[in-house]
Regions:
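Alpha-helical scaffold domains
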Residues: 1-147
Length: 147
């Protein structure tokens, strides 16, 4: 496989992720309360540099999310384009949240959308634990980064 590049497809990224994951990392995630049911065993220290290499791409981020794989979903958040993601896509992603880690990561992307305040209101009123947490994670991110 070639080196990571902006032209990589979602399938290329997933294949690469499958090749670098470890069972040791996967087991370690559980100790931190991270849902590892779909995890390949790759830490954020490896995912973030990969995301910088493949760059942002909205359509690819949607395809990565749809794999259901923990690391692919984190890559979707890291490489998503906040000006292109639709509010309906944000709502759909939030409905899939199953871990504090994914909530806190995707919240960073959501805050950069033009409709983030509307999402905060909706998500804060939601009964689902991780959707509601998203509202508060978004507010925390906004308080620090949107001055």
């Amino acid at each position: 496989m070639s080196l990571p590049a902006p032209g990589w497809t979602a399938q290329d990224i997933v294949a690469h992720l499958r090749s670098i994951g470890t069972e040791e990392n996967r087991a370690g995630m559980a100790r931190f309360g991270i849902n590892n049911a779909t995890a390949l065993g790759i830490g954020n220290a490896d995912l973030r540099p990969l995301a910088r290499k493949v760059k942002r791409n909205h359509e690819r981020s949607l395809a990565l999310w749809d794999t259901g794989i923990r690391e692919a979903r984190l890559m979707a958040a890291f490489t998503g384009e906040p000006k292109k993601i639709a509010i309906e896509e944000c709502r759909r992603w939030a409905g899939d949240f199953d871990s504090w880690e994914i909530v806190d990561t995707v919240s960073d992307l959501f805050v950069d959308t033009p409709f983030w305040r509307q999402l905060v209101e909706e998500f804060a009123a939601d009964e689902r634990e991780f959707v509601r947490r998203t509202a508060f994670a978004m507010l925390a991110w906004a308080a620090v980064h949107l001055k």
